[in-house]
Amino acid sequence: MIDQYKHQQLRIGSVSPQQISTWANKILPNGERVGEVTKPYTFHYKTNKPEKDGLFCERIFGPIKSGICACGNYRVIGDKKKDRKSCEQCGVEFVDSRIRRYQMGYIKLACPVTHVWYLKRLPSYIANLLDKPLKELEGLVYCDFSFARPIAKKPTFLRLRGLFEYEIQSWKYSIPLFFTTQGFDTFRNREISTGAGAIREQLADLDLRIIIDSSLVEWKELGEDGPTGNEWEDRKVGRRKDFLVRRMELAKHFIRTNIDPKWMVLCLLPVLPPELRPIVQIDGGKLMSSDINELYRRVIYRNNTLTDLLTTSRSTPGELIMCQEKLVQEAVDTLLDNGIRGQPMRDGHNKVYKSFSDVIEGKEGRFRETLLGKRVDYSGRSVIVVGPSLSLYQCGLPREIAIELFQTFVIRSLIRQQLASNIGVAKSKIREKKPIVWEILREVMRGHPVLLNRAPTLHRLGIQAFQPVLVEGRAICLHPLVRKGFNADFDGDQMAVHVPLSFEAQAEARLLMFSHINLLSPAIGDPISVPTQDMLIGLYVLTSGNRRGICVNRYNPSNHRNQNKRIYENNYKYTKEKEPFFCNSYDAIGAYRQKRINLDSPLWLRWRLDQRVIAAREAPLEVHYESLGTYYDIYGQYLIVRSIKKEILSIYIRTTVGHISIYREIEEAIQGFCQAC
């Protein structure tokens, strides 16, 4: 629907029988009104054509083929005349066959039927409005109560019967026999109110504004009383107050939306358009039909049986009529929501029928799968894994996914570079996975961003743009720092990849959606690309080092009680052989790769002659003299090599390969930032 502000919207709610009739009914040029489905048939087994007035009737729902009626006559559609032409013999209009996607029909129910969503769903709207227990209403709807309190205010037999303190037991056996008498209809109309008709009468007598006023007065009275001191009574009062609030809100909703409560009881049952419940022919000539067709057939069968009982035979026992009304109610319940009353209905293969509720709800329902989310071209999906070698703005695409996503671009490049004469030759080269294909694919990907999306997309960081690179394997590689924006984990999460096709979409991806641009949370402004979990553990391992340093072991006051032999052993552990010296960081990392030292092994790294390394008043822990006159001033974390004239020849700092690695990463990042500025 389109509101007054020209906004397209979809609203689900109750509708009047007149509205249902308006949707389904149409008047043919000969004056005949069609729209009611009266037969439970689909297609004729000989002619393979839809049955007249059946669930696929062409007069009601429109022609199967555009411009062709059931007789086989053809007319050009699109005539500008106001009156749509139809066949004089079969009554089928000459219109587009797409009308079968939205043209509805209806079933005229022989008895009122309660909508199971409003009765059985919690909270029960009908029970809330009538202020009656749900079990009592269910017994009334499904005819489990033979008698109900009369709706009329005039004195009746049942009202007088309710005044007796004790009930004669023989009544329980004698009254059912009265159902078989000829005067039962008169007695039933006056004394008995049962089934969905009783619910409809009570809902029709409601005044919503009186309900709001009376509920508000009762709520205030309960609030003025205050706590009683009895926990059970206080809880009971609290539940009653909550119920009154829900009842007032429900009544206000009905007033605001201009919905009559009696519309929750159906008199006309809408029939979905045929294209939404198709019958499809598969291999071998077999037919596959939607479960909704079978459920509609069950409703029509039982409704026609009840109609025959009410119209053709006046001597039908009352219990049989009530039983048939119950069957109609159960058939409509199964159509709307199979299994809501307990055991679901199954077919001959013990498979549960898929009702209308099953079709529209859930992840695979009509709304989420077809309307809210759709399958689109140029998209793929795979598991995400960590790509530690990737930049923040890059993502790794497996070869299988990349060649499918960018296949059209690769084909165009192959033809432009005269490496393929036509599309077929280009596709064959792609299937054969020629080396030139991967080179062109890398070139295409170099200038084309992709979008990664992780469902559910709760905020704008749930979908970001990346520069794709080819990776081996079948998983999408992702930089670990962008994990938090997607709220993803590398424990089996899946992400979808989309290719923006238009220039506008590519420009938007580059300027607004790239991951290295979205570094702050759009909600609170805090940094969102921060190291967490495995990255923090890795940084800790890199920078932890070996705690057995000079100060910890040799000059710790708690070790003064150690014997000279132990001190001698400690001195031996920190010689040049145990703590090697390196001229630069490249030599240190090379030694680590050759497995000569460990990641946390202490080492001495030659440093530039920077006086800032030397503390102003720090005294050396040891001084080692060489035979040529040079000597070493050894401090806690560095040492200084001096000449005989006390000139500084070189400085060595005590570090580990882990510290060197993280320092180099930070230095490269700072240099790259300075160049970018």
Swiss-Prot record:
Its EC number is 2.7.7.6. Binds 1 Mg(2+) ion per subunit. Binds 1 Zn(2+) ion per subunit. It is an enzyme of class 2 (transferase). GO terms for cellular component: chloroplast; DNA-directed RNA polymerase complex; mitochondrion. InterPro entries: DNA-dir_RpoC_beta_prime, RNA_pol_asu, RNA_pol_N, RNA_pol_Rpb1_1, RNA_pol_Rpb1_3_sf, RNA_pol_Rpb1_clamp_domain, RNApol_RpoC1. Zn(2+) binds at C69, C71, C87, C90. It holds the Pfam family RNA_pol_Rpb1_2. It is found in: Plastid, Chloroplast. Mg(2+) binds at D489, D491, D493. It comes from the Eukaryota. Its main location: plastid. DNA-dependent RNA polymerase catalyzes the transcription of DNA into RNA using the four ribonucleoside triphosphates as substrates. Belongs to the RNA polymerase beta' chain family. RpoC1 subfamily. In plastids the minimal PEP RNA polymerase catalytic core is composed of four subunits: alpha, beta, beta', and beta''. When a (nuclear-encoded) sigma factor is associated with the core the holoenzyme is formed, which can initiate transcription. HAMAP family: RNApol_bact_RpoC1. This is DNA-directed RNA polymerase subunit beta'. It comes from Daucus carota.
